[in-house]
Amino acid sequence: MVTHIVFWRFLDEANGQDREANMERVSSALQALPALIPEIETLEVGRDFNRSGAAFDLALYTRFASREHLATYQAHPEHQKVKDLVVAVVAETAVVDYES
């Protein structure tokens, strides 16, 4: 299995909306992806509740059967649409991919 985890720190305001509205838009868009991309085995989206200075705002946890399935997901047009939305509203991104 391949696990793909992404963390985002959102801008205070972007695209005419505040941080909370943009987090909701991104979260909803991500949660719609499993119905559109069959290679996704597991997808969870979570908001940070601790709000420490080192914390990111939103996390994505996904699992795939193989590296090839991850690559298919990353190249999928629906994923690209969400990625375009994310790039416009986040200040920082951290990613890790690993096999287990």
Language-model segments: which ranges?
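Short S/T/G/P-rich N-terminal loop/turn motif that feeds into the first structured element of a domain
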Residues: 1-56, 65-71, 99-100
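C-terminal structural segments of small proteins and small subunits
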Residues: 64-94
